[in-house]
Swiss-Prot record:
Functional summary from the UniProt entry: Probable ion channel inhibitor.
Family designation: Belongs to the neurotoxin 10 (Hwtx-1) family. 06 (F4b) subfamily.
Tissue expression summary: Expressed by the venom gland.
Signal peptide start-end: 1-21
GO MF term list: ion channel inhibitor activity; toxin activity
Propeptide boundaries: 22-48
Location relative to the cell: Secreted
Organism: Chilobrachys guangxiensis (Chinese earth tiger tarantula)
Cross-referenced InterPro entries: Huwentoxin-1
One cellular component (GO) term of this entry: extracellular region
Name the UniProt record assigns to this protein: U2-theraphotoxin-Cg1b 1
Keyword vocabulary terms for this entry: Disulfide bond, Ion channel impairing toxin, Knottin, Secreted, Signal, Toxin
Disulfide bonds: C49-C63, C56-C68, C62-C76
UniProt note: domains: The presence of a 'disulfide through disulfide knot' structurally defines this protein as a knottin.
Length: 84
């Protein structure tokens, strides 16, 4: 009997924590300030270069020693150089 009461109380506690965390998270996700800050983070960070066979539009999209090949679809390929 004591074990079943303890298990029931533990389950209620876990359910309370999960539901309160979900409610708190949904309030934060709907706020426009949160969305604006995330937008600023993604705009301000420097973009990585594209690796071999990655999609590209210009040579500057590709990593060093790679160039954008214009066949459809465009992709980054080795430009034939060995320099560092």
């Amino acid at each position: 009997m004591k074990v079943s009461v303890l298990i029931t109380l533990a389950v209620w506690g876990v359910m309370f924590l999960l539901t309160s965390a979900q409610e708190r998270g949904s309030d934060q996700m709907d706020s426009p300030a949160w969305l604006k800050s995330m937008e600023r983070i993604f705009q301000s960070e420097e973009r990585e270069c594209r690796w071999m066979f990655g999609g590209c539009t210009t040579d500057s999209d590709c990593c060093e020693h790679l160039g954008c090949r214009w066949e459809k679809p465009s992709w980054c390929a080795w430009d034939g150089t060995f320099r560092k």
